[in-house]
Amino acid sequence: MALNKEDILTWLEGAKTMEVVDLVTAIEEKFGVTAAVAAGVGGAVSAGSADSEEQTEFDVILMSFGDSKINVIKEVRAITGLGLGEAKALVEAAPKAIKEGLSKSDAEELKKKLEAVGAKVEVK
């Protein structure tokens, strides 16, 4: 008796996970294929379409505080509204996000403010 596609799908629905894993492994060995190739192709297509969309939200990342740690801490406090201890911890943990989900103009403005007090900043 020959199996058709429906018979195989019915068996797969009731099969245990390890049985399916064993089947996939046997198919890979028998026919010299890998199951990962199909998943990789779909991932490449979706990654390409994501690149074509323009980024609308930006994160301001403090890369380092440079030579003026105190001034950077003061500016981070002013920007974030954090207390002295939290701002100091944030600055010392660089590279660290200062603000996330900003518009491009707001992110660039914060970058300029932080660079004016000696910080090294990136907008991503």
UniProtKB/Swiss-Prot annotation:
Does Ribosomal protein appear among the keywords?
A: yes
- Which keywords does this chain's UniProt record carry? Ribonucleoprotein, Ribosomal protein
Coiled-coil ranges from the UniProt annotation: none
Instruction: Extract one GO BP annotation from the record.
Output: translation
Q: Please give the InterPro entries that the UniProt record associates with this protein.
A: Ribosomal_bL12, Ribosomal_bL12_C, Ribosomal_bL12_C/ClpS-like, Ribosomal_bL12_oligo, Ribosomal_bL12_oligo_N_sf
- An annotated Gene Ontology molecular function: mRNA binding
Q: Which GO terms describe its cellular component?
A: cytosolic large ribosomal subunit
Q: Which Pfam families match?
A: Ribosomal_L12 (PF00542), Ribosomal_L12_N (PF16320)
What NCBIfam families does this protein map onto? L12
Q: Which family does it belong to?
A: Belongs to the bacterial ribosomal protein bL12 family.
- Function text: Forms part of the ribosomal stalk which helps the ribosome interact with GTP-bound translation factors. Is thus essential for accurate translation.
Quaternary arrangement and interactors, per the entry?
Homodimer. Part of the ribosomal stalk of the 50S ribosomal subunit. Forms a multimeric L10(L12)X complex, where L10 forms an elongated spine to which 2 to 4 L12 dimers bind in a sequential fashion. Binds GTP-bound translation factors.
- What is the protein's given name? Large ribosomal subunit protein bL12
